[in-house]
């Protein structure tokens, strides 16, 4: 039953189909199969039933096959069938198989003659079949009948093309012998997707139903309308035989008897019939599978590689292991601690390139957000001067002071130090938010165990909240310490002598390091948001902020400068985000009501995120550009002018202002240094230590271990699906690896002239039927066949004798010396030697003397006569 290599390769494909159909991956593997294509009533169903040896396909009028049927024939000692959608049930009665096919078709398509591309998978085990995999497709029809949809022709054509377009599918084009072959829809569709003819095998049915006196010998010998892989003829049961319950095995025996006894076919009887078709398909499928295996292996390996990382944590899963939950708990807690530390401390392993980690965000809070909050307190110049003047007046009381009181300095400094509490506590809150967010990100890997994840988040968050109180207490203590003693002997403090000589302008710029040099504070892309559409609309530029100016360029190469804006008298204000905009905007304006850029009183700069806006604001503060003051605080402006009338008071205010500015800068520097250290020590490092050393004990004491490690139903299903897919891929690769390299492939037939298929609306050069008559047309020897008007082909001699080694005579249609006294009845019909009837050397341009109405030479056959070629 077929060659040995075939028996190994086809079960391989069947195993692969089952493995991947169960996990929904079959459509991606492009497995080698044979698609059966044919028109309605072409004998397609009979061909399939002859393979199985049983009646199992639905029959009826109109369109019966409305879903593709993937039919896997498997050689087995017992005979039964099973469907993939009800795999546990074995069908031994093939009438039930037919009923199940009809029922499964109706479940998807309904009963209204609709069609569906979703296949039905049927496996038939039988001792009477060879190992084959076929797809039965709906019959080609053109005119809708009854309740069929108007576009039924296009629906069926699209479905057929979907299956036969795949390069890994062989096409079995079924055409009845009593139909003009050039009008075969099956061959036309095959030609569309397989123009080289490498995947198409022709099957001619209903040979026994041809008109009396005609045959399809020229077609079956691949001389008339040739295909690269040729044609195979079969004889199926008639409708009368089916209704009469004629046994298929008896039909196969009758088929063999037909070919052996028919004078036009018995010389090639060993190459005709259903058994030979089975063997031929096995050989072709063997070649096709061997060619597809490298690509198939590559696809499987790529899918396996993509699953490797996801399956890694499931590989050693043992549900029956009593220590499994304990091991899993220890592993999860340990992994959680490692992930938390990596996100906080940073790591070169598996770096996230899409967003900032928790540690990077905390770093921005320490060195951008917190300094920004501190600097915001320094810009309220008028309020500070008013407070200093009030302090000096109140200290002097009714007396007129001659000297600047140092008590006013201490009072103002202590008041400024108290203001540090709010930004410091806000910094702690921001860090806590990032820590809790980091904890939630790390526990996402515990989603397999919902209770464990919930408990871990609760315990760690509770601990962070406990550390929050201690951290805030320590920070408030630091501020109280700064407030308790004003150290005027600090090395960085300017003292009274220097303070009297400082001006406000110099004081503003002393916070900028290396003020004699041009220091670049920040570079980056910003969008100028308020340029009118008439002038080109919003544009993105490369901005460079220095200690003295803000410049923008066309690109980051900084070659083409667009503008340079000095920072004098500039301030920052917030701009409300637009309704349809996803940009975050802030504005720069001049306090003296001058245009900042061209005719713009302010330029609106847009960033992609609020974090970028805060970062740019902090950079502008370093350059001495402060945020705009609220208008509500200017209500006491009239009183401010009262103190400006006294020159002595003005000098005293200026002196204390410089002293306060110097000392507050010292405190800010100290706080900026101590805040990150305090938070790291009391909160972040303690949290890391708690996770590593105490979290496991808290988990054990909080709940039962079994309840903690209870898997979610979704995760269990996901794990099972992934493991099943992973093992199916590995099994498929192992099966492919076991294929013997000694399997021999059959060479591909040489190409033929199949241009007759190009004209889809025309007819064949000559009809495929060859009449057999007792009357000889005039002008030709009766038993000699001339070349057909089709493509001139060299015949394939089957059983030809050596008596035809002499060269032919070009002027004659055939060798005349083979006849005795020109008597065509002097030989019995030894048909196997008849292919030599066409002289191989006749030039293609010699016209045939055949009458136009006769497609081939008539021949009278009498079995009792001696051989014509004796």
Swiss-Prot record:
GO biological process: actin filament bundle organization; aorta development; autophagy; centrosome cycle; coronary vasculature development; membrane tubulation; neuron projection morphogenesis; phagocytosis
Region (G1 motif): 38-45
Record region (G2 motif): 64-66
Any GO MF annotation of the entry: phosphatidylinositol-4,5-bisphosphate binding
Region of interest: Disordered: 741-870
Positions bearing N6-acetyllysine: 299, 598
Enzyme Commission no: 3.6.5.5
Modified residues (Phosphotyrosine): 231, 597
Signal peptide: none
Region G4 motif, residue ranges: 205-208
Presence of the UniProt keyword Hydrolase in the record: yes
Pro residues: bias regions: 826-846
Annotated SMART domains: DYNc (SM00053), GED (SM00302), PH (SM00233)
Compartments (UniProt record): Cytoplasm, Cytoskeleton; Cytoplasmic vesicle, Clathrin-coated vesicle; Cell projection, Uropodium; Endosome
Residues holding GDP: 41, 43-46, 59-60, 206, 208, 211, 236-237, 239
Family to which this protein belongs: Belongs to the TRAFAC class dynamin-like GTPase superfamily. Dynamin/Fzo/YdjA family.
The name this protein goes by in its record: Dynamin-2
Organism field: Mus musculus (Mouse)
